[in-house]
């Protein structure tokens, strides 16, 4: 992000490995980098329960300048007012946001469960509203099909080649580490 070389990236961390905490500490680090000129960090989730969970997680560590978008209008207002903070929102709050809200390049979007939300209208509206933003997808189950492809949405390098993952911690790695117990059926 500091160098501005890659505008997208995909992080595959298996379920239960701490994606929310990784997002939290990533947001914290990005907010403190002077080179980013006080960026806006947008945390995007796809379910109301995840919205509440991640808001609670961020609140527990008292990440400064963190707020939750409570409505479509609330999110639109926060973005239009050039708020330099961490904003937590569901993807659905981008419904009917066809206008450009922020032109700045120091807007960084961390998308939880990226494999589920980036093929539809709301994702297109989010990208249209924030055309110069950085988009980083977090997933435990990337999809690699012709009609839905997490790698295509987040793994393209400036030269058009696909960079599969910025970081990879899959189920095999979790089992090897002892963080996940394998299940055997008889």
Label each PLM-derived region with a short phrase.
Residues 1-186:
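RecA-like P-loop NTPase motor core of helicase/translocase proteins
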